[in-house]
Amino acid sequence: MSAATPSVIRLPRDTSAQHAARPAFVGSDPLTYGEFTARVEAVAARLLSLGTRTGDRIAVWMDKQPRYAEAIVAALEAGCAYVPLDGGQPVSRVRTILADAEPVVLFTDAHHAALLGDDDLPASVTTVVAVGDALPDTVGGIPVAPWESWEQGRAGRVTLLPSLTPGDLAALLYTSGSTGTPKGVQISHGALANFVAWARDELDVGPDDVFAGHASFNFDLSTFDLFTALSCGAAVWIVPDAATKDVTALAEGIRRHRITVWYSVPSVLHLLTTSAALTPEHAASLRYVLFAGEVFPVPQLRALRELLPPGTPLYNLYGPTETNVCTYHRVRPEDLHRATPVPIGLPITGAGTTVVDDAGRTVREPGAIGELHVSGVCVTPGYWRRAEEPVSTAHCRGVHPTGDLVSYEEDGRLVYRGRKDRMVKLSGYRVELGEIEAAALRHPGIAEAAVLVDGSGPKARLRLYYTLCEGAERIGLVELKQHCARHLPTYMVPHGAVRLDRMPLNPNGKTDYRRLGLDAPPRPAAPLGTAR
């Protein structure tokens, strides 16, 4: 990028020049901006010494910690793209993602390095760097380099940042795929820089703020926590994996670290507000609360409002991974008494929105429902190595058909109305039900599989319906869940299962999802949490 083009790769360096002694990360592993920048520059120099080129992928698989952020920023400073992997993902899924992304370097920790077998790394990986004690000598036949040796600056430091264009690849974020295989969403430098610039313009944040890094680094919400904070000299509390759903630990962390900016999915905020852990005293430092990823029921939003300091701004942000945040809405007092969900609002700077009906015509009248199409710099170039997909073809035209149904309100704000397809949101994560079905069908005893969601919001649960192969023995729920957990992240493992004699079909011979659970099977459907 030219000097005139904003880029997230300059953020830590520019901030460190002004705030070297100020905290960049707080918590169990605190770092100042000076310390963090020195580490990043040393690691970036080592990457460049390997001969990495612009757009090369750098994978990161470890527990959440400041070194995870260090690996991300170092990859970007070297002109590479980061591929973040959640620490809780099963090895089989990690293997699939690594094979698709073909990274040249893997940053990991001792625990996750020990989980990898000889055949789990693709041939593209030439270097493995790990943090922790008792590191294995090799992973997949590749010697493991201690992280500390990379931080010592033996390769010098990066003095000249790479020249990048807005279209260059910054990250590959893997999401659930309808075909049963995760797909990588390409995030460009231009899109990332545009989002951070909008956030800085919209929010009055600076060096005195502390962001809560609640989201997993493989979730697009994390780009706000990390890069917005680094852009303004604020500190980040990277919420440990074990604390992400522990309301007591979260509430105490908010109080202890005096968190001023919170961003998460609504279900986490609902857990906090319905527990006795979060009190007005714990929340006293909060200056901004933002949420995204799923609908926030208005009664739950009212309960949150009552716990926060008077006047604390609440923001509803919207956008699939393919666009990151593309619309926003600052909650108004009257929104707390709506009968319908809070609006997803208006486009951010650099984004355009169009509502399209089934015939492809633009919808403008208030109340009329259509699919939301997003355009602008925020839109991904497409899915990694899936240029043949229809959505990728649309991306070539700079448009992302979201699959989300919306309508306009009288004032021009958008309201979310549901989905066109079988993609759902659970705890903010995008879940393609077809991927769960594909994983279930890998069990040798299952002939057919279908997945539905029971309930909504924080009470949403996945239920698997299946038929057995001829001659197969009965499968217990524990076995089914263990099987799915070997191929899927925890949030995609079904909570309950129902065995059917036959799968209901529509006139076209396809699974009739509307009849699942409605038709009376030969035996009563198993209640949630049981299997027959």
From Swiss-Prot:
Family annotation (Gene3D superfamilies): 3.30.300.30, N-terminal domain of ligase-like (3.40.50.12780)
Organism superkingdom: Bacteria
One Gene Ontology MF term: ATP binding
Keyword Transmembrane helix (UniProt): no
Enzyme Commission numbers on file: 6.2.1.53
Record's catalysed reaction(s): holo-[peptidyl-carrier protein] + L-proline + ATP = L-prolyl-[peptidyl-carrier protein] + AMP + diphosphate
Region (Disordered): 510-532
Keywords assigned by UniProt, alphabetized: ATP-binding, Ligase, Nucleotide-binding
Function: Involved in the biosynthesis of undecylprodigiosin. Catalyzes the conversion of L-proline to L-prolyl-AMP and the transfer of the L-prolyl group to acyl carrier protein RedO.
Homology family: Belongs to the ATP-dependent AMP-binding enzyme family.
Protein name: L-proline--[L-prolyl-carrier protein] ligase
Organism: Streptomyces coelicolor (strain ATCC BAA-471 / A3(2) / M145)
Gene behind the chain: redM
